[in-house]
């Protein structure tokens, strides 16, 4: 079996490659990323290509499955650049899958694709995927879900799987996630237990997470199995302010959502940090997901708990952990994080 993976050098992509490499049914893997990494894995060959611009049909020819992970979080101050890769690039991937006659497509959707929903009960995959209007990320995830709806109608012979995970963490993603969401001004020591005196106990601030290795196992099962459709991917427990405070050895302090959003908005507009306020809206609005279908139809079961994945991420952020790929490499930040400052904090991708 030959598998092509776009966005293969990031947090999720590297774990997906490792999971596919271990599967005897997979003979060869083509990893596609904007920049060729130093990482070497058995069965894996690399091609440097941008899904928003490169000719993809030739790269997909002969593949038994394409796993589409490529996605931009930054530059958050360049909306058109995000849309060009996230929506335009996805459309080009789907078109190339059809033209190359690839029989299976596995797409990395997200909890962010869902319309606002409940936090006191879990919803299944039938919940509407209208996204969160104020979130760039959610807008694009919802738009790509619509593209995929059209693709499935026009290409019924292609087996399509959509995975909708919560937040995905691992040790090696520590530096990447710190760069993407906290920026160069936040010291690593701030992620140590006891460093923060309090965490915001904001109403509806409850989220789900999964370890990258467990998410990767879901992708592997989707590739080598016969299932199709959408699948929620998340581990237990749901992370709420009380649990988050316990993990950080901090006190939960009630903070209104409006104050949290205002802080994010002002600091983002001043380019003090790279996360726009839409991420706060997304965190407060998206529903809690029921992952029973993935367990039932994919045979997926997470090995690690959500809080264990979060603690591993915090360790990676504290230690500056990474891996030998451009998105994960701590050295990419440069001395004193100079390369991050040169992006104007959300002005362009690193």
Which residues does each PLM region occupy?
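N-terminal Rossmann NAD(P)H-binding glycine-rich loop of SDR-like oxidoreductase domains
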Residues: 1-22
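Conserved Rossmann-fold NAD(P)-dependent oxidoreductase catalytic core, especially the SDR/UDP-sugar
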Residues: 92-137
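Active-site Tyr-X1-5-Lys
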Residues: 134-161
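NAD(P)-dependent short-chain dehydrogenase/reductase
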Residues: 151-207
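Alpha-helical substrate-binding/gating segment
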Residues: 186-238
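Mid/C-terminal beta-alpha module of Rossmann-like enzyme folds, strongest
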Residues: 215-277, 291, 311-312, 320, ...
């Amino acid at each position: 079996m030959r598998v092509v993976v776009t966005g293969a050098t990031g947090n999720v992509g590297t774990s997906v490659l490792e999971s596919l490499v271990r599967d005897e049914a997979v003979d060869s893997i083509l990893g596609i990323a904007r920049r060729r990494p130093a990482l070497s894995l058995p069965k894996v060959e690399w091609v440097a290509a941008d899904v928003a611009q490169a000719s993809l049909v030739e790269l997909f020819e002969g593949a038994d499955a394409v796993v589409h992970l490529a996605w931009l979080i930054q530059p958050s101050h360049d909306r058109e650049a995000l849309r060009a890769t996230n929506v335009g690039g996805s459309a080009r991937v789907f078109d190339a899958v059809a033209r190359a006659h690839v029989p299976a497509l596995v797409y990395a959707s997200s909890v962010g694709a869902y319309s606002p929903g409940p936090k006191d009960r879990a919803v299944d995959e039938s919940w509407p995927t209208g996204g969160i209007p104020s979130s760039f990320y959610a807008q694009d995830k919802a738009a790509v879900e619509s593209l995929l709806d059209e693709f499935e109608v026009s290409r019924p012979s292609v087996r399509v799987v959509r995975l909708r995970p919560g937040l995905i963490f691992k040790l090696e993603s520590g530096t990447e996630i710190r760069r993407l969401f906290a920026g160069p001004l936040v010291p690593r020591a701030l992620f140590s237990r006891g460093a923060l005196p309090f965490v915001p106990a904001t109403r509806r601030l409850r989220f789900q997470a999964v370890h990258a290795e467990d998410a990767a196992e879901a992708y592997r099962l989707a590739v080598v199995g016969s299932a199709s459709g959408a699948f929620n991917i998340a581990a237990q427990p749901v992370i709420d302010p009380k649990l988050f405070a316990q993990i950080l050895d901090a006190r939960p302090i009630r903070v209104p959502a409006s104050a949290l959003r205002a802080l994010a908005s002002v600091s983002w507009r001043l380019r003090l940090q790279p996360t726009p306020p839409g991420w706060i809206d997304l965190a407060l609005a998206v529903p809690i997901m029921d992952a029973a279908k993935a367990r039932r139809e994919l045979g997926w079961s997470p090995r690690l708990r959500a809080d264990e994945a979060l603690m591993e991420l915090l360790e990676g952020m504290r230690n500056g952990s990474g891996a030998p790929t451009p998105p994960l490499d701590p050295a990419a930040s440069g001395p004193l994080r100079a390369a991050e400052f040169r992006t104007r904090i959300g002005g362009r991708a690193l």
